[in-house]
Amino acid sequence: MNEKTDDIILAFESSADETSAAVVKNGNTILSNVVATQIASHQRFGGIVPEVASRHHLEWINRVTEEALTKAGINDPERQLSAVAATYGPGLVGSLLVGLMAGKTFAMVHHLPFIAVNHLAGHISAANFVKATVYPALAIMVSGGHTELLWMEKENTFQIIGTTLDDAAGEAFDKVGRILGLKYPAGKEIQEMAGHGKAVIKFPIAHTEDDFDFSFSGLKSSVLNYVHHHEQVSEEFNRNDVAASFQKAVVEAITEKSRLAIEKFQPKELLLGGGVAANLALRTAFENLSKEYKIELTEAPIKLSGDNAAMIGAAAYLNYKQRLFAPLDLNVDPSLNFARM
């Protein structure tokens, strides 16, 4: 590898239950992306246990780092790397600390600039592995912890125009999965069940005071009431139909709010990212929305929809171009978010 002919960044991600390190070139090419998942450790609890997650991160952070560097052919970091990046929020405080400390330590030891990355910017920046974004753009970020509409007037700028008032879409999937007796995380299994069912149950879509905000707690409660009612009166019901109807309600809620935002802000491109962006029904709905409004749509690749360090490297590159470096005494920010428009 030639000496810094490209901008190459080593990135870390550990905000929740994935321990990941990646090496990314010029913000759009993955040289390596290693992810160690903890799903099996959290399944019996029905969700992420912060203490368990932190312990796993500590066990895996050095291993994923070594593997990422080896796969990318990095044997002289100070010469071959341009910077080091890590997620510093939002997320679980103990989990965030592991990746942030790994990144800051690596940067200090190898005399490299350090870049702090907003996890949400990472999810949106995963689209850069597909193509360069045309601005202004409307980003739809749908994950386990966040559901947001973000206005991007230009590169590396994010303003919230809509957010969830309670449960995030991914959280609603997991809670409904629990109601249906599914293992955590439930998103993929609900999608599979929905494919075998019919969306014949009319679950409500919340109408919020702000045109662009979301609410999924009422939908979750409606599913719970439907299932409990049928169980209490010993009346059979089709679980696949429940899954299909719930999924349809979530997809409609997200696309309808996005439709309103498209009509008001007139973006040149739509970006879809986050773990729930792997849902095929949601992707199809946005592909149809894109065609309807004749706006280009870029979806994060399914394999990069979940938490991973490659997306952090893509977001870090945008900061690197602007020389937005962070001090090595930076701390984590578990509740980090963008400013509201």
UniProtKB/Swiss-Prot annotation:
**Amino acids binding Fe cation:** H119, H123, D307
Q: What keywords are assigned to this protein?
A: Acyltransferase, Cytoplasm, Iron, Metal-binding, Transferase, tRNA processing
GO annotation, biological process? tRNA threonylcarbamoyladenosine modification
Q: How is the cofactor bound?
A: Binds 1 Fe(2+) ion per subunit.
Enzyme Commission number(s) of this protein: 2.3.1.234
Q: Does the keyword Iron apply?
A: yes
Q: Where does substrate bind?
A: M141, V142, S143, G144, G145, D174, G187, N279
User: Which co-factor is required?
Assistant: Fe(2+)
Which locations, inside or outside the cell, does it occupy? Answer: Cytoplasm
Q: Which family does it belong to?
A: Belongs to the KAE1 / TsaD family.
Q: What does this protein do?
A: Required for the formation of a threonylcarbamoyl group on adenosine at position 37 (t(6)A37) in tRNAs that read codons beginning with adenine. Is involved in the transfer of the threonylcarbamoyl moiety of threonylcarbamoyl-AMP (TC-AMP) to the N6 group of A37, together with TsaE and TsaB. TsaD likely plays a direct catalytic role in this reaction.
- List the protein's name: tRNA N6-adenosine threonylcarbamoyltransferase
Question: What species is given as this protein's source?
Answer: Oenococcus oeni (strain ATCC BAA-331 / PSU-1)
